[in-house]
Amino acid sequence: MIRFAIIGTNWITDRFLESAADIEDFQLTAVYSRSAERAGEFAAKHNAAHAFSDLQEMAASDCFDAVYIASPNALHKEQAVLFMNHGKHVLCEKPFASNTKETEEMISAAKANGVVLMEAMKTTFLPNFKELKKHLHKIGTVRRFTASYCQYSSRYDAFRSGTVLNAFQPELSNGSLMDIGVYCIYPAVVLFGAPKDVKANGYALSSGVDGEGTVILSYDGFEAVLMHSKISTSYAPAEIQGEDGTIVIDTIHRPERVEIRYRDGRLENIAIPDPKPAMFYEAEEFVTLIKENKLESEENTFERSLTTAKIMEEARKQMGIVYPADQA
């Protein structure tokens, strides 16, 4: 049995725990919130025996083996390193950290302490993303990849009214690129590797974070054009265009409908049924790594997390988006 703690008492931790409930060797034993009352309420809700409002005290506790970090982006590195230095395995929400330097520090801490560290990028473990990879060769030489994750934020109305909530605060290393653009970039890295060049532009909000943008990754013979937005919504599918056909994906962050449209007019549906919650597979992978004494995922590798961090840092640089964490 792997005993888990969680940092964060929000909708994403609720969803993670609901997904992990189907994993036989998963047990939630500890909850952290800055509010002792909130920690206690969340622990009671999910039958966790321990509630903490002090991170140092929690890290030193022996009541859990691993921690799932779902705090604001700017806090990921500090919290992850703290827990790894106390011998705890860490599953950290995407994006791993604010920038490349912090990502490197997290990876170094994992290696130094001999613990598992994995970025919680759920997409790469989903059955239909794996099917996409399996059938990619059928479209011949790839000539273009397009993907978008554009979703009007539920917090943007407040921003427009003059209230800047966490989702749009540079102090927390937030913004469209970091929060949802990563769902386009990470799959591109998994499918095609590190790009030769990165070009980016976008719209900066008055708070100092990006509201939307486009990232173009250059590869040998093709480009990946990736669009992200928290101030508008897109319904366009993702496409991997090859010389012999095109793979059409309904949504890149959670593929459910995936088909190949061949140049000769044939249509092949390659999607498979997926009854599990989306976050189940990343939790299952993480638990398996711990049980098998493996320190790094073969799918969400350190190299892929670091490449993604480098791309996003370069994209932010070109957009003129600077976080306080960049100046630390």
Curated annotation (Swiss-Prot):
* EC number, as in UniProt: 1.1.1.371
- Is Ligase included in the keywords of this UniProt record? no
Q: What induces it?
A: Is not induced in the presence of scyllo-inositol or myo-inositol.
UniProt superkingdom? Bacteria
Q: Which reaction does it catalyse?
A: scyllo-inositol + NADP(+) = scyllo-inosose + NADPH + H(+)
What's the stated role of this polypeptide?
A: Catalyzes the NADPH-dependent reduction of scyllo-inosose (SIS) to scyllo-inositol (SI) in vitro, but is unable to dehydrogenate scyllo-inositol and myo-inositol. Is less efficient than the functional paralog IolW. Under physiological conditions, may primarily function as an NADPH-dependent oxidoreductase that reduces carbonyl group(s) in its substrates. Cannot use NADH instead of NADPH.
Q: Which residues form a coiled coil?
A: none
Regarding protein family, the annotation reads: Belongs to the Gfo/Idh/MocA family.
| Molecular functions per Gene Ontology | nucleotide binding; scyllo-inositol dehydrogenase (NADP+) activity
Keyword terms of this UniProt record: NADP, Oxidoreductase
* Species the sequence originates in: Bacillus subtilis (strain 168)
This protein's record includes keyword Transmembrane:
no
Q: What is this protein called?
A: scyllo-inositol 2-dehydrogenase (NADP(+)) IolU
